[in-house]
Amino acid sequence: MSDESILVRLQAEMVRCMKEKDAETLSTVRMLKTALMAAKTAKPKDSTLGGDEEIEVLQRYVKNRREAIEMNVKVGRAELNAAEEREIAVTQRFLPAPVSEDELAAIVKAAVVSTGAAGPKEMGKVIGVVMAQVKGRAEGSAVSRLVKQALGI
């Protein structure tokens, strides 16, 4: 991922989509930009979104799209999922590369050792250490699942 902000990259992608007449991607990019701008205006005046905050906004967007997919399946409208999947794919281009399952398992094992966690009561401590290390590159559900495995829960 480059050093420039996600907002700048989204703006460049909007220009590219307009030139290439890519309406589907343009629609998603506009929604992402709107979500970032809304998060920025929710902050105090003269403050900006940091890189981590931008990533959180996009991750929240992906999470919402995944929830929409689940709801579509529950109500029998699975045909709507193609658009949701496209939006997820576009959004993920602006997020940091996810950590692999093997890397995540190694990070979890190291966190269990470093915290000295032995049971379910210390699960939160381990998850906190792991989430701080992976910062937006792994989903909380995957971290939780691997921590439970490592602690034998």
Predicted segment positions?
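Charged, compositionally biased, marginally structured helical/coil segments
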Residues: 1-153
